[in-house]
Amino acid sequence: MKKLLIIFLTFLFLTTFANSQSRFGELTEIRDEKMRGKDNQWVRPHPGPFIWNHIEKEKGNFNWEETDKYVLYAQEHNQTILATIWPHANWEQKSCKRKKAKSPFGKKFTKYLSKPCSMDDYKTFLLMLIDRYDGDGSNDMPGLTKPIKYWDIMNEPEFKMFFKGSEEDFVEIFNFSSKVIKEKQPDAVIVMAGAAGMFPENIKYWKSALPKIKDHFDIANIHHISGPDGQCDKELWVDEFAALLKSVDVNKPIWLTEAMTCGPPVKAWVNAFLNGAELIIDVGVNAPGKKMSKKGRKKLNKFIANYDGFTSIKSISEKKVEFTYKDGTKKILEF
């Protein structure tokens, strides 16, 4: 079935995007010079500084030093931030004796990954976070010129390494967060917590969860990380994810916000775009796991530099696509 779909797309598929801003980005870690992202593109700090435990280490005591660093750097390099919100604070989870979890990011993260004990305390943090970076001129970060508009609520909740809670807990946190953000920042764009691939267990989780959150996010979100066996999906899961969304009556743009490939990256990126991805965020040169070859990285960077900003992509043949731009110009890529 998948082979038939690819053949069909080869001759017919056309994807049109709403605008022509950058279609590319990277996961970033500001402490690593090679992981700070490219100018004029998207960045998704990961895990990033938007962690309740980092910002409010004690109740009522907010420290914005780390978050401000990321925002200021992004402004200086004309990067658009996709901010991942992590709703966990050690002090808060201790208040109702939550069990500790193994941190997926070591000591720099948090010791607890459960649902907040007090949604009111979480709301206070969330409102403070949005208020500082929404750009409304009230209580903004000093020097803020490029507000944060895109908010990614949580990360791969179907994996216990990132969230120690039930599906119902996730749904409650997600919908609650979305409502709070939208009320405070009406032009905010809510990005679904990234699905950790499209393996059977992922599909089962999201087939149940998506109908419960679909009215509370604007962008659907999928991740593709190569497994321990080093295997990758040719379309970086975008085709399976699109099919899942359709099966639960979700009609939203698709972003691929963690892209790791073990084959030719340009081909994989093109296949993902052809299957409906509007934005692809690379995991970055120093991300854990399998590394992209230097040759592959060079080709990917050249592809991004030469073809970014397109408004639509059309498959012409099995190894040729056509990109269209806002001014009507077209570019052909053979890969």
Question: Which residues make up each language-model segment?
Answer:
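Short, flexible/disordered intra-domain loops and linkers
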Residues: 55-60, 97, 163, 231-232, ...
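A cross-domain feature marking catalytic cores of carbohydrate-active enzymes
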Residues: 28-30, 45-47, 83-87, 152-155, ...
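Sec-dependent N-terminal signal peptides
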Residues: 4-14
